[in-house]
Amino acid sequence: MSAKNIDELIALCKRRGFIFQSSEIYGGTQGLYDYGPLGVELKNNIKNSWWKSTVYERDDVEGLDAAILTKQSVLKHSGHEDTFSDPLVDCKSCGERFRADQVPDYCKKEDLTEPRQFNLMFKTNVGPVDDGSSFAYLRPETAQQIFTNFKNVVDSTARNIPFGIAQIGKAFRNEITLKSFIFRVREFEQMELEFFVVPGTDEDWHKEWVESRLVWWENQGVSRAVSYTHLRAHETGSY
């Protein structure tokens, strides 16, 4: 989408009460948006539809609503603390910072610093003491608490594999480069399902879930061709 069309879309969303720049009257906060009267209803309709099709209409999925603040050791053991990062460069000419693979044309190569890794997780402290024991993160995705609560869900529901755990919730990423309106932001919501299967049955389950999700997207008015062919080969590895 061209910059002109994006600007027109942003203006329309604000004018009709879908999305506003967060803290706009104080100059706004880059990468943060507030959903207005129509926006919150649209978002809730999408979430309710997804939850209904993923949890309520199936007998093999349980729901979860986990905490946003995440213990440091969880994200250390998951690998996020060491690898959830993007390469960052500084332009010595303009003074701006960019992802190494998204440097604008007006910055010359010789003006860039060597790339260094920038962790995308927001850090915070839990409790009144600012020391190592209180260190935590705002979760960068909704998956980790599903895994850490796996045994709790199994013990409390007597579930056996195959079954899934679904969650809708906020996630936070301190993105270096923000672009395309709400398509890359620092605070957003995810609708996530982790489905656990018996080894050797993963391909069959994958096909079933792909078809199920395509039907759901069609019910939202999105063409099956658009929702499926957008996934390129290198994007499907974790799916």
Task: Give the role of each language-model region.
Residues 195-203:
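A generic structural motif
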Residues 2-15, 19-184:
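Class II aminoacyl-tRNA synthetase-like tRNA-binding/catalytic domains
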Residues 31-35, 191-196:
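Short, hydrophobic beta-strand segments
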Residues 229-236:
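Conserved small/polar residues in nucleotide/adenosyl-binding loops
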Residues 56-62, 219-226:
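Surface-exposed helix-capping loop/turn segments at secondary-structure junctions
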Residues 25-26, 187-194:
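Glycine-rich, often proline-containing surface loops adjacent to acidic residues and nearby aromatics
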Residues 203-224:
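Long, well-ordered alpha-helical scaffolding segments within enzyme catalytic domains
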